[in-house]
Every structure is written in C-alpha cells, then in structure tokens.
Amino acid sequence: MKAVILLSGGLDSSTILYKAKADGCECHAISFDYQQRHRQELQSALTVAKKAAIAKHQVVNFDLRQWGGSALTDDAIDLPQQRSLDEMSQNIPVTYVPARNTIFLSFALGYAEAIAAERVYIGVNALDYSGYPDCRPDYIEAMQEVFRLGTKQGREGQPIKIVAPLINLKKTEIIQLGNELGVPWELTWSCYAGNDVACGVCDSCRLRLAAFAELGLVDPLVYA
C-alpha cells in the first residue's frame, strides 16, 4: 500500500512516518520549504527520511513570507518565549501559519493521486496546548470530504484516506508511541527559533521538554 507522509522533521511527523512504515506502507514523504523561520527542520526531515530508508522523499518549495501573518513567516512578529502550558492554552498562538495544513494537504493530495497512493498520513494532534484550528478532528473530517469530492479516485469510489494516528494523543503518548516504533528523537527538530541549536524556551521546545520530563526521560536533542 502506497502512502504519502507529511514530514516536517519534527517529533510528531517523524512518529507518523515510522507508524506508516509499521503499517506496512510504501512511504513517499513530502516536506515543505516555505521559507519558514525554523528551516532547520528540513535537514531533520532529510535525515529522518534517510534513516527510515523510505521509498522516496522530496521537498516542495514556495515562499509564505510573501504573505506573512505568522511568527514563523514574519520576523517582525516575536516568538512567544517562556510561556507556561496554561498560557499556551489560552488562544491560537502567533505561530499559527494561515491555512498551512490546508496548503500542505492539497499538495499531498495531488502527489498521492499522481502516484496512486491510498493514504496520506499527517501528524496533527488536537490535545496539544497550541490549539491550531487545522489540527482538530472536525478539520480532518472536512478535508477527508474534500479528498473524496475533489479527486478522480474519490469520485470513482476509492477516495484517498487521511490517516491522523496522533489526533487524540497527548505529547507524552506520542513519545511513548515513538519509542515503541524506534523513532530517532535525536534526529528530530521542534524548535521555532531558527537557530543552529534548539532554544528550549519557545512554545514548541517547552511542550517537547515537558513531555519528556513527565515521562521521566531525557530528551536527546541538544538545547542552548
């Protein structure tokens, strides 16, 4: 079974890559260089894909800095730092990139239909503190309908399936799953700051570090 995997190089997407492999899929990973602040994740995506020895990995290039609207695509917007988990849960953060998962899933859908893949794996999870609107179950359900209505395969009764195995998992549970699957955490990248070493203070770093600490584990990634 062929599957397209949305691979950022982060903790979640690396876990779903290994999950797709465990599911017996022939994995075709796709990553995006959209001129994001944290482009270091692309090197992690390349390294993780190589380590996993998948069928194919490619990077799609486009520039979302032309639009801005996010701390990840506009350097004039400061990254939140040193926020507590409670503070992160108050509202949609400035690190939300407008419609990013819709853009990514559209590319993944086109790629999947072109290579006759049956599945698209995405690492969204609705229980993270950063409550992005395009990481929620109702969004995935709506996009599944787009997959059904917007493709030849879908209209012929064989829609490409969106697989979101992390959708109801907490970060600690994702790490536990990744450990079972053998995900190489030391190769992954979560930091938003755009430095050569993970900052340890942005929301993404803090969520990751807190989850490892809650499990009594040491995060193998090096932090500043």
Curated annotation (Swiss-Prot):
UniProt keyword Ligase present: yes
Residues binding ATP, per UniProt: 7-17
GO MF annotations, alphabetized: ATP binding; ligase activity, forming carbon-nitrogen bonds; zinc ion binding
Details of cofactor binding: Binds 1 zinc ion per subunit.
Cofactor dependency: Zn(2+)
Pathway field: Purine metabolism; 7-cyano-7-deazaguanine biosynthesis
Record-level GO BP terms: queuosine biosynthetic process
Disulphides: none
Binding site for Zn(2+): 191, 199, 202, 205
Superkingdom per UniProt: Bacteria
EC number: 6.3.4.20
EC class (word): ligase
Catalytic activity: 7-carboxy-7-deazaguanine + NH4(+) + ATP = 7-cyano-7-deazaguanine + ADP + phosphate + H2O + H(+)
Family: Belongs to the QueC family.
Function (record text): Catalyzes the ATP-dependent conversion of 7-carboxy-7-deazaguanine (CDG) to 7-cyano-7-deazaguanine (preQ(0)).
PANTHER family recorded: 7-CYANO-7-DEAZAGUANINE SYNTHASE
Protein name per its UniProtKB record: 7-cyano-7-deazaguanine synthase
Organism, as annotated: Nostoc punctiforme (strain ATCC 29133 / PCC 73102)
